Amino acid sequence: MSSRFSSAPYDAYAALSTADIKHPTITLSTGPAVALTYGQYRAILATNRNQSDRAAAFAAYHELFAANVNTYASLYNGVLQRDWFHAQSRGYRSTLEAALHGNNIPTTVVENLIESTKAGTEPLRRYHRLRKRVLGLDTYHNYDGAIPIVDLDRKYSL
């Protein structure tokens, strides 16, 4: 019975972020107006070489979530409260300990992973600087990460 209620935050999130979403329309620099579905959003980020088009798609798509930020925050709080309740009722010291127990992973593994990740971000930053330079961008943003560095349209035949 508990699991049925435990899925309520996820079910509400899924309905809000898919079925109830009103996709915005943006106008690209080439002229056409595009209904910004998730598929169109990903396609623009991955194929459109115009940074201002990618920026417009990014802003419009994320505004969908910003419009309901309090609802999303409340749903996430429900997930956190549910997980905390389950961890406490089963005798765990934390939700992390509860999540890792089934695979017999000590919490120190995740804590070390987090610290190692924080300490090892320089290669990723160097990669982003390289992408910025190769793409000829003045600034580099999250929405620039999916665009290919080179144009390659190779056809293969069998």
Where are these regions (language model features)?
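His/Asp/Glu-rich acidic catalytic environments and adjacent acidic regulatory segments
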Residues: 1-108, 116
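Generic macromolecular interface patches on structured domains
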Residues: 19, 71, 78, 123, ...
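Long, non-coiled-coil amphipathic alpha-helical linker/lever segments
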Residues: 111-127, 143-144
